[in-house]
Amino acid sequence: MAHGPRYRVPFRRRREGKTVYRKRLKLLLSGKPRLVVRRFNSNILAQLVEYDPKGDRVIFTIHSNVLKKYGWKGHRGNLPSAYLVGLIAGYEALKRGYKEAVLDIGRYKSTKGNALYAVLKGALDAGLNIPHSETILPSEDRIRGEHIANYAKMLKENEELYKKQFSRYLKEGLDPEQLPNHFEEVKQKIISQYQ
C-alpha cells in the first residue's frame, strides 16, 4: 500500500469493490430511474432505484423467490426465470407510473445473451422503455429454456447423471424436457395478473 503525504484513500465502496463511480455518474446523469439487476448463484434480483441526495431510494424489489407464487418449479437462477423476474419488474414499474429506466448491471461483465439481459428483455416485453442494443438480448429459444430441455434430452441416456443434474426439477414434479411449456404457462399467469 502506498504511503506518504500525497497518498489519497479511495472511497470506501471503491476500496471494497462495490461501486464504480465513473459508471454510476453516467447512469445518474441520465435522470432516469435505474433498473438494478443482480445475479446470485441460485437467484436473480431486480430493483427499480431512484437517486436521492441522502441515499438512493428503492421503489420496489423483485426477487426470483416470487416466482413460486406463480407456480414456477424450475431453477430460480437460470435464463427463463431471469426473464420472468424482468417481466414482473417491468409490469410493477408501469403500475407505479414509471415508463422508462436505464439498466444498471453493476460490476458484472457485459456478456451477450446472459441472464442480466434476460431480465432486460422481460422488462422490455412488459412495456418499460430502456435504451439497449438488440444484439445483446438472448434469443427466444434460450429465454423459453429450449437449451435446458435439449440438454435434459441428451443427458437422459445416463440415468444417474440425469437424476443428479435435474434433482430439483424432478423433486418439484417437473420434467426438465417440458420446461419451455412450463415457462409459457407461468408467463401467461404473470401477464394475466397485470392486465
UniProtKB/Swiss-Prot annotation:
Gene3D superfamilies per record: 3.30.420.100
Any single GO BP term: translation
The keyword Ribosomal protein is annotated on this UniProt entry: yes
Annotated Gene Ontology cellular component terms: cytosolic large ribosomal subunit
Cross-referenced Pfam families: Ribosomal_L5e (PF17144)
A molecular function GO annotation: 5S rRNA binding
Alphabetically ordered keywords of this record: Ribonucleoprotein, Ribosomal protein, RNA-binding, rRNA-binding
Listed NCBIfam families: PRK08569.1 (NF006342)
Assembly: Part of the 50S ribosomal subunit. Contacts the 5S and 23S rRNAs.
Protein family membership: Belongs to the universal ribosomal protein uL18 family.
Described purpose of this protein according to its UniProt entry: This is one of the proteins that bind and probably mediate the attachment of the 5S RNA into the large ribosomal subunit, where it forms part of the central protuberance.
Protein name: Large ribosomal subunit protein uL18
Native organism: Nanoarchaeum equitans (strain Kin4-M)
